[in-house]
């Protein structure tokens, strides 16, 4: 059994760790609420964009789709994958789940004879692919807790341009979808070619487009894809802070349990030491009497 002094040192160390994890939990809770507000604030814009897209894509059919982001290639030979991860760890299994899903997607695509280029948002994803010898074709790191749209445009435009030039036949994004504080799950979404939103869920309004429906569509399609990427980044940030808050709360609770167990061990060790001293004194007294 460890000495009383050693156990006391461990108790002090665990209490210090618990203070740190408790502080990190409170910080993450504050950042999570802010990230949730950011996600909710962008949804009306995304919903409105989806309505306009549904109306436009229903009008533009056939040959008018060729050369646009709506065009589906007959043969898919090359795919681009955008992977969204945090810059920091200590958020449970969130990063591992996203990267595991990305790895499975890459394996599936290669099994079909397709090449895959990876673009990363966040340091964790970038470092993972660099370690595995899979250098990202583009990256964006240090996005912060409330990034602006401009922060993701460099990577987004590069990937979209790759599709427009014929370098890529499809474009996908993998990120951590925010469900609620306790649930975040890896999600994969096809970005290109753009799939027409369901027109049955939109209000049927006969808009007049200037200069033409095709020109407006060609202008709005890249913005639509950029908005989808931005929304995925915001969802991932909200998921990150939620997962970190829960992880730090669990760490704090585990530290409290460990302190309780160590305190019990300390009391037992102290009691054993006292019993030993009393026994030695009694033995010495008995020896003197005899």
Curated annotation (Swiss-Prot):
Membrane topology: Peripheral membrane protein
Recorded GO CC terms: plasma membrane; proton-transporting ATP synthase complex
Localization (cell): Cell membrane
Annotated GO biological process: proton motive force-driven plasma membrane ATP synthesis
Taxonomy, superkingdom: Bacteria
Regions crossing the membrane: none
A GO term, aspect molecular function: proton-transporting ATP synthase activity, rotational mechanism
Keyword line: ATP synthesis, Cell membrane, CF(1), Hydrogen ion transport, Ion transport, Membrane, Transport
InterPro entries noted in UniProt: ATP_synth_F1_ATPase_gsu, ATP_synth_F1_gsu, ATP_synth_F1_gsu_CS
Classification via Gene3D superfamilies: 3.40.1380.10, ATP synthase, gamma subunit, helix hairpin domain
Primary residence: membrane
Job of this protein: Produces ATP from ADP in the presence of a proton gradient across the membrane. The gamma chain is believed to be important in regulating ATPase activity and the flow of protons through the CF(0) complex.
Subunit relationships: F-type ATPases have 2 components, CF(1) - the catalytic core - and CF(0) - the membrane proton channel. CF(1) has five subunits: alpha(3), beta(3), gamma(1), delta(1), epsilon(1). CF(0) has three main subunits: a, b and c.
Protein family membership: Belongs to the ATPase gamma chain family.
UniProt name for this protein: ATP synthase gamma chain
Source species of the chain: Chloroflexus aggregans (strain MD-66 / DSM 9485)
Lineage, highest ranks first: Bacteria, Bacillati, Chloroflexota, Chloroflexia, Chloroflexales
Gene that produces this protein: atpG
């Amino acid at each position: 059994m460890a000495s009383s002094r050693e156990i006391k040192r461990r108790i002090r160390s665990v209490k210090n760790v618990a203070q740190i994890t408790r502080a990190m939990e409170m910080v993450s809770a504050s950042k999570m609420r802010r990230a949730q507000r950011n996600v909710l604030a962008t949804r009306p814009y995304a919903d409105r964009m989806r309505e306009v897209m549904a109306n436009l894509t229903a009008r533009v059919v056939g040959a008018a789709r060729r050369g646009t982001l709506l065009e589906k290639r007959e043969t898919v030979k090359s795919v681009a994958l955008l992977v969204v991860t945090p810059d920091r760890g200590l958020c449970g299994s969130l990063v591992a789940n996203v990267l595991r899903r990305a790895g499975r997607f890459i394996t599936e695509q290669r099994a079909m004879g397709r090449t895959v280029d990876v673009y990363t948002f966040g340091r964790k994803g970038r470092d993972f692919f660099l370690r595995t010898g899979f250098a990202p074709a583009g990256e964006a790191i240090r996005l912060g807790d409330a990034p602006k749209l401009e922060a993701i445009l460099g990577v987004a435009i590069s990937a979209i341009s790759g599709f427009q030039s014929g370098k890529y036949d499809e474009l996908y994004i993998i990120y951590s979808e925010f469900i609620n504080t306790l649930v975040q799950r890896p999600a994969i979404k096809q970005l290109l070619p753009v799939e027409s939103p369901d027109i049955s869920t939109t209000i049927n309004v006969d808009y007049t487009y200037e200069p033409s429906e095709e020109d407006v569509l060609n202008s709005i399609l890249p913005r639509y894809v950029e908005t989808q990427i931005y929304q995925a980044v915001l969802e991932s940030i909200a998921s990150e802070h939620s997962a970190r808050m829960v992880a730090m709360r669990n760490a704090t609770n585990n530290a409290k349990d460990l302190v309780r167990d160590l305190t019990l061990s300390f009391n037992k060790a102290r009691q054993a030491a006292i019993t030993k001293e009393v026994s030695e004194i009694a033995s010495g007294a008995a020896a003197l009497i005899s």
